Amino acid sequence: MKIIANNYKPNEIIKIIREWSEKTQQEFAENLGKNKNTIQSWELGRNKMTLNTLMEIAKKENLIITIERK
């Protein structure tokens, strides 16, 4: 499956990644060494994650992040 990240807010992207992983917020958090409240805050857009965190998540979930010109 593929998404065009430009069409989504950062909080929507993290939720999509978690849902693709078929993990609960708790399971996803444990896999990343975070707590459930952190995941919940990201998904609700209360807190933003860094690019480094996104790259770490992508690596752990076996996802590829690409950047290309239009």
Predicted regions and their residues:
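N-terminal flexible/basic segments that precede or flank functional cores
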Residues: 1-8, 20, 44, 62-64
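Residue-level recognition of specific faces of alpha-helices
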Residues: 13, 38-41, 53
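DNA major-groove recognition helix of helix-turn-helix/homeodomain DNA-binding modules
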Residues: 50-67
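Short basic helix-loop element that most often maps to the first helix and adjoining turn
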Residues: 12-31, 56
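Residue-level preference for nonpolar/small residues embedded in alpha-helices
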Residues: 10, 49-50
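Recognition helix of helix-turn-helix/homeodomain-like DNA-binding domains
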Residues: 33-48
